[in-house]
Structure formats: C-alpha cells, structure tokens
Amino acid sequence: MIGFNALGHLGRLGNQMFQFAALKGIARNRGYQYCIPPSQMQGEWKDHHQYYNAVGTGAAQHQLLQPFKLQNTNQLNLQFIDADRPVVQEGSFTFNEDLFNNCPDWVTIQGFFQTEKYFKHIRDEIKGDFEFKDEISSPCKDMMAEIDEPVSLHIRRTDYISNPNHSALGLEYYEKALRTFDKRSTIVVFSDDPDWCNEQELFASDRFLVAEENSAYVDMC
C-alpha cells in the first residue's frame, strides 16, 4: 500500500485532485493498494492556515471527501501510512517515469504530480471518482439547463494579487479570449472575487452572468 500523508498540505482542491489521481495511478501501475488520510476539514478552503496549521499534528485537511463521490474509495483507502515509512518525493514538475514504474511499496509519496501521465491509464475510473455529489451537481445542472450554449469564464484573484509566485491576469487577457466565442453566447463568470467582476465594464452587458455563490465546488461543477 502507498499513501499521500501530506494530502491537503500541498495546495488547494485542484492540486489535491492531481495528487489523488497520481497516487491511484501509480498504485495501479505497480499493483498496490492506495490510501489517503481521512480529513477533518470543515467547509471550503478560505485561508492557507487551515492547511498548514495542521502539519505535524496527524490531522489531514484535504477537501476531496466533501464535493466528490469518490465512488471507488472504501474505508481501507482512508488511512495514513505509518509515519516511520519512507517519503518518496516527486523530484520536479515533470513526469517522473522512474517513480511511476518503480515506486516501492509501503511509502508515502509527496509532490504536485501535475500531469495526466500518472493516471491516463485509469482515466475513466478517475472521472467516476470526481463525480460531484448530487447536492452540488443538481442545482448546477438546473441552472445551466436554462442557458443556451453557455461559456464559462473563471477568474482567480484574491490570493494571486498578493502572491509573488503568481500574478492576476489583466482584463485585456479575458477580452482577447472572449473574441474567440460567438458574441451571442452567454458568459457565466465564476470568481473568488465576484464583487470586483461586477464592477468591471467588460462584464456589464446582459450577456454576462456573474455567479454569486463564491463556492469553489459550485464553480468547478
């Protein structure tokens, strides 16, 4: 069995999805069982301290159990790898073929694993794992059914504005992207800063709908 004890301490929901999928893909390729920690997280990610304050306490703070059915995951898959077991690092932001093909058993892997090469052989199963729970997907489907040929526009601002490792894209980027779509399309704007979006002239016309839920789960769904 291999695990990912640091799940939830290395990024938000998107990162956690890559990490889970890679863990499962590596385990399947090697013929192992896999496990992720049970999570104590309540609500959605709002502050990085929710993650990092739990490091070293034996508490997990990942989000995967909240929005997704994880229908191929059972109780055996919800546990920590023993703390005295080796930690195997990804090593870089590129595909680690050696780790994929030669990962030892009874270790916890660690990294970002941001490539589908780790899990493309179990693509359909991963898609099933990441099916949203009905309480999230049902209202989203109802809303989108009322919009003819919608286009989703996602704008991340809050943490990117102050993070020196990232940058918030300017309005000219979105304006250029929108030119590739039919001007009659309805644009649904999802953002962690909906108030800012509502203030922008670019999104003022009737073809734009700014989602007010401010929920990462609803926005992704």
Identify the role of each PLM range.
Residues L13, F181-C221:
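Donor-binding and catalytic core of enzymes assembling or modifying cell-surface/extracellular glycoconjugates
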Residues R28-Q33, Q71, Q75, K176-S185, ...:
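Structural alpha-beta junctions
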Residues M1-E44:
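N-terminal pre-catalytic "stem/leader" segment of glycosyltransferase-like enzymes
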Residues G8-Q16, N163-G170, A216:
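Aromatic-acidic/polar surface patches that form glycan- and anion
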